[in-house]
């Protein structure tokens, strides 16, 4: 299961602790009936200044919280895509990767696919074209 999430929660005022707790609860629910299920948490992506202006620091802190959570939780992997969308932590996203300043466009999704593929298909010769 891949989670690509977090930005709407930040926009609605949830704290990083609340957000991580919500995802922990979802994971625990699934693991109760399927303990071998694997999870990937994709980092919360940055936005352009058009969306959630001033929230870049919160996005960075949420990603650190997700990473810590994944490091201590069995069968959960944190994958960084933030770096591909942003020059450095705390700055706004490259606008050419987002359709509206918030959601990835085709080029942005291709970038995500390239980043996720090794985690989803580690034993194959699958190539993205």
Listing of model-derived features with the role each one plays in the protein:
Residues 1-5, 9, 38-43, 77-80, ...:
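Structural recognition of the beta-strand scaffold that forms the well-ordered cores
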């Amino acid at each position: 299961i891949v989670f690509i999430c977090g930005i709407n929660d930040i926009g609605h005022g949830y704290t990083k602790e609340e957000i991580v707790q919500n995802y922990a609860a979802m994971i625990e629910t699934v693991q109760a009936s399927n303990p071998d299920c694997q999870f990937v948490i994709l980092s919360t992506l940055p936005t352009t200044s058009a969306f959630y202006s001033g929230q870049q620091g919160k996005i960075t802190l949420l990603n650190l919280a997700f990473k810590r959570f994944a490091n201590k939780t069995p069968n959960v992997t944190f994958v960084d895509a933030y770096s591909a969308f942003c020059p450095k932590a705390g700055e706004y996203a490259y606008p050419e990767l987002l359709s509206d300043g918030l959601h990835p466009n085709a080029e942005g999704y291709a970038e995500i696919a390239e980043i996720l593929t090794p985690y989803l298909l580690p034993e194959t010769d699958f190539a993205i074209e």
